[in-house]
């Protein structure tokens, strides 16, 4: 991905609400509650940041338990945005927590038909965070769920 991030002011709370609206049919089908907390402002490409957050949220919905929840929280501290995408799914095994950001990688290839996609979502998340001077990682994962953390420069 060679595109340079555009310099647009991005307010994250309305963007997250839009993502939740787009994911509502999938979430409702599985009884997943969507929750947002906090807000922040950054400079970058609104289309790319939307794609990054959408991919994280969509995975959190798709790989969740029935009647689970997805929470996106945003905190702005000094010159950094701290974004957490937390779900109540079954977690990501420790040995795969770095590999999941590689293109076409899947933790469980046998489930790819069930969930769709080709395994590019998290590699795009990694690239988009990097294009904006940030980073993404699995902060926590257990049988109670997973938390992805993203840090990006704030406005």
Regions inferred by a protein language model and the residue ranges of each:
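Short alpha-helical Gxxx[C/S/T] motif in the catalytic ATP-binding
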Residues: 116, 121, 125
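Short conserved segment of the HATPase_c
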Residues: 92-106
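Acidic ATP/Mg2+-coordinating residue in the GHKL
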Residues: 87
């Amino acid at each position: 991905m060679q595109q340079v991030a555009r310099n647009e002011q991005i307010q994250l709370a309305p963007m997250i609400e839009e993502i939740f609206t787009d994911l509502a049919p999938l979430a409702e089908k599985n009884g997943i509650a969507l929750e947002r907390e906090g807000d922040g402002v950054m400079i970058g490409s609104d289309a790319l940041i939307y794609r990054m957050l959408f991919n994280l949220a969509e995975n959190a919905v798709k790989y969740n338990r029935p009647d689970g929840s997805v929470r996106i929280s945003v905190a702005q501290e000094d010159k950094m945005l701290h974004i957490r995408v937390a779900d109540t799914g079954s977690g990501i095994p420790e040995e795969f927590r770095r590999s999941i950001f590689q293109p076409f990688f899947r933790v469980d290839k046998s489930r790819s038909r069930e969930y769709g996609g080709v395994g590019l979502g998290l590699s795009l998340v990694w690239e988009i965070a990097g294009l904006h001077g940030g980073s993404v990682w699995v902060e926590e994962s257990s049988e109670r769920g997973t938390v992805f953390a993203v840090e990006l420069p704030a406005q």
